[in-house]
């Protein structure tokens, strides 16, 4: 897990989500033991394991969906430490029964907000290979959010360096 301020990128992503949400469902796969050891004693973090994690993120969303017990949920990546309370609040204020996909200058981002019904329909879509494809087949709204952070995930060493430079 990559360092971020006084913790890790995942620590920051979870902390930011918990500023708005009352719990986080954390789906582990690769490095599951490390993740479990780090977060298992936090009552507002529910850890689920995806044995098929190597098959892609969509399988993790399917595993996490089984732990959703609220009317709506956000879906985001654990490598997006710059999402904050304001971003979650803006998207939440627009909630409806559709999938709300935030965009920055037309580029889709995160967190995506879904009703539980919409989530269950999306993960049940036949012949889709990823969540975005599943969401776009169902009822959805693309919502413009004037905040580049919704598109800034840290996937490469260059992304990590750029993110660190933004926070110096």
Predicted features along the sequence, with ranges:
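Conserved alpha/beta core of the MobA/IspD/sugar-nucleotide pyrophosphorylase nucleotidyltransferase superfamily
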Residues: 120, 124-168
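Active-site acidic Asp-centered loop
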Residues: 76-78
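Conserved donor nucleotide-binding strand/loop of the catalytic core
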Residues: 42-55
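N-terminal glycine-rich phosphate-binding loop and ensuing alpha1 helix
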Residues: 1-29
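Conserved donor-nucleotide/metal-binding helix-loop-beta segment in metal-dependent transferases, i.e.
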Residues: 83-107
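Short aromatic/hydrophobic "clamp" motif used to bind/position activated sugar donors
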Residues: 72-74
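Short beta-strand-to-loop element that shapes/binds the nucleotide-sugar donor at the catalytic cleft/hinge
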Residues: 30, 100-117
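Glycine-rich, basic loop-to-helix element that forms the pyrophosphate-binding segment
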Residues: 55-64
């Amino acid at each position: 897990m990559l360092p971020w301020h006084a913790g890790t990128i995942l620590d920051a992503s979870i902390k930011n989500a918990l500023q708005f949400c009352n719990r986080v469902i954390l789906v582990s796969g690769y490095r599951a033991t490390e993740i479990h050891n780090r977060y298992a004693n936090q009552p507002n973090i529910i850890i689920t394991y995806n044995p098929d994690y190597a098959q892609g993120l969509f399988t993790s969303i399917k595993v996490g969906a089984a732990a959703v017990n609220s009317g709506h949920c956000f879906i985001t990546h654990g490598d997006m430490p710059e999402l904050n309370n304001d971003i979650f609040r803006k998207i939440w204020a627009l909630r409806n029964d559709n999938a709300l996909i935030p965009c920055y200058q037309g580029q889709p981002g995160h967190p995506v907000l879904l009703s539980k019904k919409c989530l269950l329909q999306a993960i049940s879509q036949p012949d889709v290979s990823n969540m975005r494809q599943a969401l776009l087949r169902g009822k959805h709204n693309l919502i413009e959010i004037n905040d580049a952070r919704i598109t800034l995930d840290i996937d490469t060493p260059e992304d990590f360096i750029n993110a660190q430079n933004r926070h110096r």
